Regions:
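Conserved beta-strand segments of alpha/beta enzyme cores
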Residues: 25-27, 130, 147, 165
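Pocket-forming structural segment of enzyme catalytic cores
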Residues: 89-155
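N-terminal beta1-alpha1 cap of cysteine-dependent amidohydrolase-like domains
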Residues: 1-57, 63-66, 72, 177-181, ...
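Cysteine-nucleophile active-site neighborhood
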Residues: 48-119
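C-terminal and late-domain segments of enzyme folds
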Residues: 10, 135-198
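Redox-cofactor binding/interface segments in oxidoreductases and associated redox assembly factors
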Residues: 43, 75, 167
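Beta-strand-turn-beta hairpins that frame and shape the catalytic cleft
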Residues: 1-2, 126-129, 159-165
Length: 198
């Protein structure tokens, strides 16, 4: 199974290492046509206003929205911002894939970044992980279809809806594989079930 990593900016190489640990094939996505050759997509961290300009210039908004209708998408940090319904910054154009509103850089500057122990609930199982927050966005509203997988300081920091998963932290920096596995093995299996049932 080939998983695309949006390679416009951000530290996308570490996501590739996580995918390889799960026996998934990483593929860098730099052009909209690259989406035709992958079965899922990661929108990595970066700077969300810059990402808005790069995605707009390359025509990614329409192509990712269409791709996400039938394929799993995972967004981390700025990737979560891009997947949200709305960010509290008019410079940012979002994809509207997750029914959440976001406040960007809620954890402060990069020097205030931190690593925290979180309890994550996936598939009815709870497990602790170390989560690295870097200028992390904060979810300030979420809709009824959102499944909260983890919270930090009383706010959701890992959410899922349908085939889409958003995280305000960077699991790839701590070698955490459970979210990539959930997005591209568990959620992807739902697609196969739908196809078989059709």
């Amino acid at each position: 199974m080939k998983i695309g990593i949006l390679a416009l900016q951000g530290d996308f190489n570490k996501h590739g290492l996580i995918l390889e640990q799960l026996d998934l094939e990483p593929a860098l996505v730099r052009y909209t046509s690259d989406l035709n050759h992958v079965n899922g997509l990661i929108i990595p961290g970066g700077e969300s206003t810059t990402m808005t300009k790069l995605m707009d210039r390359a025509g990614f908004y329409e192509s990712i929205t269409s791709f996400a209708n039938t394929n799993p998408v995972l967004g981390t940090c700025a990737g979560l911002i891009m997947m949200s319904y709305q960010a509290k910054d008019r410079r940012i154009k979002t994809l509207g894939l997750l029914d959440v509103d976001i406040e960007r850089n809620a954890s402060g500057r990069q020097i205030h970044s931190l690593c925290k122990l979180l309890n994550v609930n996936i598939n009815g199982k709870s497990q602790p992980i170390d989560a690295t927050f870097i200028r992390a966005p904060k979810i300030i509203r979420y809709g009824p279809d959102i499944n909260v997988l983890a919270t930090f300081n009383g706010s959701p920091c890992a959410v899922q809806s349908g085939l889409h998963l958003g995280l305000s932290f960077h699991p790839e920096l701590n070698g955490i594989t459970i979210f990539h596995e959930f997005a591209f093995k568990k959620l992807a299996a739902l697609i196969e079930e739908r196809v078989d049932a059709a």
